[in-house]
């Protein structure tokens, strides 16, 4: 098994990333790369899937896959249960890192920064366009808590369906969005012989500085 893992590799030869291709600020490049991923990546890859890393109050890291649900000039938005493990971690230490990986394009984007809650109005607006099952699930699931078995979860959902049988569910107070306000964004383009292209943007005094990093 160890040798098999050691032999697993691929060479990246699809494209390069030069300073001439990169704008002065990172959002334009992210929009371009994300649009390329939407057009190019095929299921089961989801272009808006990302790894979100957080740190708990003891300094221990945690990561999981989430879906990006908003992007504007302020930052990158995702939604979750505020009482979940990640919600508690962000309450204790409001900083996070995101990583997008688009294997067909041989590209990766790393984003780091401070995290803030979005407004209740923004959370409600997104909540209302979710499928009904997802809206009910936000009420039914005590996310990250220990439950007895799958049947308990089904019972919680059934009770929630009965509760809202005559009305549409409102957005729960314990559920909503976070926005990561980027302070660093790195664009990685795979290249041959592991000599990858890495362009890094750092926010300093409200201005973005671009630099090339060694692979």
UniProtKB/Swiss-Prot annotation:
What does the note under cofactor report? Binds 1 FMN per subunit.
What biological processes does GO assign it? pyridoxine biosynthetic process
Q: What is catalysed by this protein?
A: pyridoxamine 5'-phosphate + O2 + H2O = pyridoxal 5'-phosphate + H2O2 + NH4(+); pyridoxine 5'-phosphate + O2 = pyridoxal 5'-phosphate + H2O2
For binding FMN, which residues are annotated in this chain's numbering? 64-69, 79-80, 86, 108, 143-144, 188, 198
Q: Please verify whether the record's keywords include Oxidoreductase.
A: yes
Q: Which cofactor does it need?
A: FMN
Matches recorded under InterPro entries? Pyridox_Oxase, Pyridox_Oxase_CS, Pyridox_Oxase_N, Pyridoxamine_oxidase_dimer_C, Split_barrel_FMN-bd
Q: Which Pfam families match?
A: PNP_phzG_C (PF10590), PNPOx_N (PF01243)
Report whether Oxidoreductase shows up as a keyword of the record: yes
**Which EC number(s) does the record attach to this protein?**
1.4.3.5
Residues that, per the record, bind substrate: 9-12, 69, 126, 130, 134, 194-196
Query: What top-level class of enzyme does the UniProt entry assign?
Result: oxidoreductase
From the UniProt record, give the pathway where this protein acts.
Cofactor metabolism; pyridoxal 5'-phosphate salvage; pyridoxal 5'-phosphate from pyridoxamine 5'-phosphate: step 1/1; Cofactor metabolism; pyridoxal 5'-phosphate salvage; pyridoxal 5'-phosphate from pyridoxine 5'-phosphate: step 1/1
> What keywords appear on the UniProt entry?
Flavoprotein, FMN, Oxidoreductase, Pyridoxine biosynthesis
GO molecular function terms attached to this record: FMN binding; pyridoxamine phosphate oxidase activity
Its quaternary organisation is: Homodimer.
**PANTHER family annotated for this entry?**
PYRIDOXINE-5'-PHOSPHATE OXIDASE, PYRIDOXINE-5-PHOSPHATE OXIDASE
* Similarity remark: Belongs to the pyridoxamine 5'-phosphate oxidase family.
Q: Function, please?
A: Catalyzes the oxidation of either pyridoxine 5'-phosphate (PNP) or pyridoxamine 5'-phosphate (PMP) into pyridoxal 5'-phosphate (PLP).
Q: What is this protein called?
A: Pyridoxine/pyridoxamine 5'-phosphate oxidase
């Amino acid at each position: 098994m160890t040798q098999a893992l050691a032999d697993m590799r691929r060479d990246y030869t699809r494209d390069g990333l030069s300073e001439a291709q990169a704008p002065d600020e990172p959002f334009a490049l992210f929009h371009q790369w994300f649009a390329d991923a939407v057009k190019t990546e095929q299921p089961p890859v989801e272009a808006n899937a990302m790894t979100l890393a957080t740190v708990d109050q003891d300094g221990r890291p945690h990561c999981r896959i989430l879906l990006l649900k908003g992007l504007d000039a302020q930052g990158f938005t995702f939604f979750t249960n505020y009482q979940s493990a990640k919600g508690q971690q962000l309450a204790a230490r409001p900083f996070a890192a995101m990583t997008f990986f688009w294997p067909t394009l041989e590209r990766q984007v790393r984003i780091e920064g401070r995290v803030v809650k979005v407004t209740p109005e923004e959370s409600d607006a997104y909540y209302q366009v979710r499928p009904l099952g997802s809206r009910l699930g936000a009420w039914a699931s005590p996310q990250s808590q220990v439950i007895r078995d799958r049947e308990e979860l089904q019972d919680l959902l059934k009770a929630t369906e009965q509760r809202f049988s005559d009305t549409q569910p409102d957005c729960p107070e314990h559920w909503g969005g976070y926005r990561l306000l980027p302070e660093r964004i790195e664009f990685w383009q795979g290249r041959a012989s592991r000599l990858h292209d890495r362009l890094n943007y750092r926010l300093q005094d409200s201005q973005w500085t671009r630099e090339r990093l060694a692979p």
